[in-house]
Swiss-Prot record:
This is Basic membrane protein A. Its main location: membrane. It comes from the Bacteria. Pfam families: Bmp. It is found in: Cell inner membrane. It comes from Borreliella burgdorferi (strain ATCC 35210 / DSM 4680 / CIP 102532 / B31). The lineage of its organism: Bacteria, Pseudomonadati, Spirochaetota, Spirochaetia, Spirochaetales. Residues 1-17 form the signal peptide.
Length: 339
């Protein structure tokens, strides 16, 4: 009888040790996704969510989603760690500092961040960053905007001015100038990625100033701008961002500058789960060449001839015949060289 009890006890210990929280050796790995804002932004955060959902379809994982805000980043990350996450994804540049802090405090945890803003400081070995050459896709849509504008005036509507949005802005402006050196470009920022009404207000003013095409990179503010274009109707057009946003206003969204953060997330997470390896301590950069940034083909708005021009430009960018600017300094250099 004592031997039977001992065997039962030993089996219980083995079961508990094997079913412990979160490691790739356990039956169901746990992947967490933390964002600033909401998942239903129809843009950046939603793209990340779609990417990790595809991972969930392919692998048997437990998915934990967390909507956060700046005053609770660290405590929310601590909660995800305590919940047994194997890999924690942080979505957006606002997590840049806390990602490093969390990684240094928890060397046994694995972290990955989308769009970090890091200098040349070393990155912890248990942290990896995904960056994007969004300017390459924006160059193509800027070219399209300049070619299609009837008024000769186009606009850019940004959320918060900074390195990430600058890549879209200056890529877009460079592409437009490459297509038409005389094109007039107006740029406005609303100071937020979560203010739909501000986006509506600024877009309304821009359209009233005879701007007929706006490229947005403003989160929910951009959704507001799309609403305005749809309400104003014919002659008021917009370029979406991150994902194909044509479904929001099929007659007004010409194209979208795609920055498929979901694809980048999917590629890295799938490889991590397949190989049980983690290549941390570095940044991984994606652009046109990797098929992660680009533009949406829309034969309803973009002619076959114009599409061929865009494909030619894409090849030049991939082959480094054109180096697309991502900030003011490189933009001014680009203008001197090409315009």
């Amino acid at each position: 009888m004592n031997k039977i009890l001992l065997l039962i006890l030993l089996e219980s210990i083995v079961f508990l040790s094997c079913s412990g929280k979160g490691s790739l050796g356990s039956e169901i790995p746990k992947v967490s996704l933390i964002i600033d804002g909401t998942f239903d932004d129809k843009s950046f955060n939603e793209s990340a969510l779609n990417g990790v959902k595809k991972v969930k379809e392919e692998f048997k994982i437990e998915l934990v989603l967390k909507e956060s805000s700046s005053n609770s980043y660290l405590s929310d990350l601590e909660g995800l760690k305590d919940a047994g996450s194997d890999l924690i994804w942080l979505i957006g540049y606002r997590f840049s500092d806390v990602a490093k802090v969390a990684a240094l405090q928890n060397p046994d945890m694995k972290y990955a961040i989308i769009d970090p803003i890091y200098s040349n400081d070393p990155i912890p070995a248990n942290l990896v960053g995904m960056t994007f050459r969004a300017q390459e896709g924006a160059f193509l849509t800027g070219y399209i905007a300049a070619k299609l504008s009837k008024t000769g005036k186009i606009g850019f509507l940004g959320g918060i001015e900074g390195e990430i949005v600058d890549a879209f802005r200056y890529g877009y402006e460079a592409g437009a100038k490459y297509a038409n050196k005389d094109i007039k470009i107006s740029t406005q920022y609303i100071g937020s990625f979560a203010d739909l009404e501000a986006g509506r207000s600024v877009a309304t003013r821009m359209y009233s100033d005879e701007i007929d095409i706006i490229h947005h990179a403003a989160g929910l503010g951009g959704i507001g701008a799309i609403e305005v274009a749809k309400e104003l109707g014919s002659g008021h057009y917009i370029i979406g961002v991150d994902e194909d946003q044509a479904y929001l206003a099929p007659d007004n969204v010409i194209t979208s500058t795609t920055k498929d953060v979901g694809r980048a997330l999917n590629i890295f997470t799938s490889n991590h789960l397949k190989t049980n390896t983690f290549e941390g301590g570095k940044l991984i950069n994606y652009g046109l060449k990797e098929g992660v940034v680009g533009f949406v083909r829309n034969p309803k708005m973009i002619s076959f001839e114009l599409e061929k021009e865009i494909d030619n430009l894409s090849s030049k960018i991939i082959n480094k015949e054109i180096i697309v600017p991502s900030n003011k300094e490189s933009y001014e250099k680009f203008l001197k060289e090409f315009i």
